[in-house]
Structures are given as structure tokens and as C-alpha cells.
Amino acid sequence: MKYKDLRDFIHGLEQRGELRRVTQPVSPVLEMTELCDRVLRAGGPALLFDAPAGHRFPVLGNLFGTPRRVALGMGVDADDEAALASLRDIGRLLSALKEPDPPKRLKDAGKLLSLAKAVWDMSPKTVSAPPCQEIVWEGDDVDLHKLPIQTCWPGDAGPLLTWGLTVTRGPNKTRQNLGIYRQQLIGRNKLIMRWLAHRGGALDFREFALKHPGQPYPVAVVLGADPATMLGAVTPVPDSLSEYQFAGLLRGARTELAKCVTPGVDALQVPARAEIVLEGFIHPQQGAPAPAPEGAPPRPAAGAAAGYEHALEGPYGDHTGYYNEQEWFPVFTVERITMRRDAIYHSTYTGKPPDEPAVLGVALNEVFVPLLQKQFAEITDFYLPPEGCSYRMAIVQMKKSYAGHAKRVMFGVWSFLRQFMYTKFIVVVDEDVNVRDWKEVIWAITTRVDPARDTVLVENTPIDYLDFASPVAGLGSKMGLDATNKWPGETQREWGRPIEMDAAVKARVDRLWTEIGLS
């Protein structure tokens, strides 16, 4: 099943019993978070709050709260286990697009051409009179307080826009970048754009500030896009492919786009059937900025981007289960808000796993596996435990071929995809260990690891600035554990042989099992 927009997806989920409408008044301040958190932990449905207290726009939460709904958003209709397997097919597609194998036969060349044609056929198309511009707020009508923006946790600095799909373009690029960055509401038409320095939006902004210093930087934020476009924004799409093209491949139909209506922002294109679109600029700082509050980190002072308006963001409850530190980020000034009639506001919360980002991480883990295997054929499985905050720990299963092989794989994972740059812990195991079973992983660690020999520590590496365990913000250490069987050269002792029952005995007991009535 393919979905043309968010409403189509909501209808499909409702038909499958995967969405529940909440007709009772529920406040966006804390109450929605508590309700969504309880439902997600129980593996329950997406929630559509029809009557959010104090607001007229319905709120959609827990949209991707199970792996099955993530797979449905990518066009795969299956239960959780089958859905995860199907997501590996999407990873194989991305792997083929990222690094196509050279054709060995004429038949292979034909497949490669077919794939290239499929990508070309999914180039987005621009439409006029799009649904996302049925209603336009401008001037004094622009008031973000009219939207039911959630305040998720008691210690949060204020309301937080969480599922905003941010559209940017660098000065030297033809393709647009789509990224999901949280945004703190600080005024009628002002949001703090929290994008980390290595993310696409921040890179585009810095390049623009260098090339066009003192010029406003155009930005659009999409709320309530179709599921394929949203998931395309969080998937490791190859640089040669736009997220809109990838969404078209998932959907099986070209992504329809609309030009923004605000002068200066109209070079950006947004999904034509989106629910709500915010259009505006990051403006240069006018006059001397106010001094930083006492105890706050210093304002950014280096680089062209430092000359733009910034504000102190946070603290907010984050996917780690803790409140993050405050930090300075650019201010996004909203000039216009466009929307569909009867628009739906899409939101989420982040907190101690499991939360929606953790579920997305479990699903996207399956997309990563073929990408890693393309580069490292010895990797046989890969798992990012959701308890590890989506990316901070990885368990790698491999087919070991020589002494020191596990350490090569550790450094390969850390360096291959940007998504693993902040992975703090990597545990490498053999093929006989199920990476998704903590009992087996701990057994391998406690029986195959000598702490001095098999622990790899790497200092002064990039670390998520939200990681308060690191000694300084953004810089910390990483740890690898080689929990594989050791080869000659790695140990001087005779290595233990795992206990395994005789195959003939197991077969006989299988028959007895039923006869005894134990099954």
C-alpha cells in the first residue's frame, strides 16, 4: 500500500487498527507526552487527538511507534518481524544506489540500467495550486502559539516543535536537504533551529553565510508530510539521490512539490500535500546582541554564521532520558504559515528509551545492515539496541578470518556512515552469537574477552554534545570490545571448545518431546 499524503496514511492505519482517535480534551502541555509514552511502551497504536485542550488543530502522535508502522510508511504491509526483514530489501536498494556493482554480464548491465531509470523516473514534479497553500497566514496573523505545540517534560524550557521537516539548500548545490531538527518556540514568529554542526542544514547554512555574508538565509519547515518523505529524511540516502527521489521510490509515485510563496524563500520546494508549512529566514544579527545570561555558555564568535541571530536553546528532555545542556543555535523567523484546510499538527516526544526515535532506530537498523555489508562483507549482522539511545552502542556479528580482524571492523563501523560517528561502544561477536539477545552477548563478553587485550579505547573523538558523560562538550572517547573467539597470535593458550549436543540425540529428543506431551 502506498500513501500519497499523511491523511491517506492515517486512513490506512485506522483501517488496520493501528490508530486510535482520542475525543476527550488532552493538553499539549505534558499530558500528551504521558499518554503517548504509556501507549508506545505497550506497543499500542498511533494517537490522533481530535480535541487538544485550548487548540483547534488535531494532533497526531506516536505515528512511528512500532516497527510495523515504520514499514507501512515505507510501503511494506507486514507484522513486526516480517516488516523488519522487508526493510533490509530497502537497505539493499540503497546499497545498490550508493555503490553499484560493476556489471559482469549483459544481464547485469540491464539491471543496472533499470535501476537508474527507476531513480530518474522518480524525479519530483512541481504542481500549482497545492493543497498545502489552501490557507495562508501572513503579517500579524502569523502566530505560532495558535499551533498545539507540545511541552513534553516538566523541566523543558517551553513548547518544542519536534517533527519539523526542515528544508534548506546550500549556495553551491542543486538538491535540497531535508532534516528533522527540534525547534524551541520563543516568540510569536520565532523558533530556535537546533541543528548540530555536522548535519546537512547546518552545513548548508554555514556555506551560505560564507558566500553571502549579511544576507538572510531562507528556510522552510514542513509539518505533516507524507510518510515516505518523512522516513526519507531520516534514512542514509546516498548523496547522489535526493530525499524526494527516494520518497518517490518508496511510494511508487513521483513526489509532488510546491514552491514556497514567500519572496526569497520561493526557491525552496516543499511537499505539495503537507499539512502545515512554515516559511521564513535566519536573519543577520541587528545591533549588538544581548549579553549571555550568567552561567550560560558563550555566544558563538567564530565563523560567518556567528554574525546571525542566535538564542540560547534548552534545556529539554532528550532521547537519552536526561535534560540536555543549554547551547546557542540560530533563530528562525517565520514570515508566513501555509496549510491545508482542517490541518493536522504532527508531533512526538523524546525521552528515556523506548521512545519514537528509538523505534525508528530499530527499524532503520535493518536498512543499515546491507549498507555495511556492501563495504564489509565479513559483517553478517548488526544491531543498535534501543536501550543504547538509538546509536550509542552497536553489536556487530562477523565472520572472522584472521587475528585482529574484529578491531578492523570496529574502526570500519566508526568511520563508514555519518550515523555511527557518535557510537560510543562497539561489541564484536562471532556468527554463533545472536546480536539481538543480550543473554548471548553477555555470555560472549564474559567468556571470550580479556579486558586488557580485547578492549580498544580511542580518545579525543567526536561525541554527541548532548552526552554529558564526556569530559568536554562534543569531544570524548570510544570503546570497542572484541568478544570473538581468539586466533593464534591473539592468545598463547588453548582456546575453549563450545559445548554442543550430538545432532542424532537432538533429533530423537525432538520426537520424544511431542510424545511426552511437552509441546
UniProtKB/Swiss-Prot annotation:
Positions contributing to Mn(2+) binding: 177, 243
Locations listed in the record: Cell membrane
Gene Ontology CC: one annotated term: plasma membrane
Presence of the UniProt keyword Cell membrane in the record: yes
Cofactor binding, note field: Binds 1 prenylated FMN per subunit.
Binding-site positions, prenylated FMN: 180-182, 194-196, 199-200
Pfam families according to UniProt: UbiD, UbiD_C, UbiD_N
Pathway(s) served: Cofactor biosynthesis; ubiquinone biosynthesis
GO molecular function: 3-octaprenyl-4-hydroxybenzoate carboxy-lyase activity; metal ion binding
A GO BP annotation: ubiquinone biosynthetic process
Entry membrane topology: Peripheral membrane protein
Needed cofactors: prenylated FMN; Mn(2+)
Documented EC number(s): 4.1.1.98
Active-site residues per Swiss-Prot or TrEMBL entry: 318
Catalysed reactions listed for this entry: a 4-hydroxy-3-(all-trans-polyprenyl)benzoate + H(+) = a 2-(all-trans-polyprenyl)phenol + CO2
Record carries keyword Methyltransferase: no
Similarity comment text for this entry: Belongs to the UbiD family.
Xref: NCBIfam families: UbiD family decarboxylase
Role according to the record: Catalyzes the decarboxylation of 3-octaprenyl-4-hydroxy benzoate to 2-octaprenylphenol, an intermediate step in ubiquinone biosynthesis.
Assembly description: Homohexamer.
Protein name: 3-octaprenyl-4-hydroxybenzoate carboxy-lyase
Species name: Burkholderia pseudomallei (strain K96243)
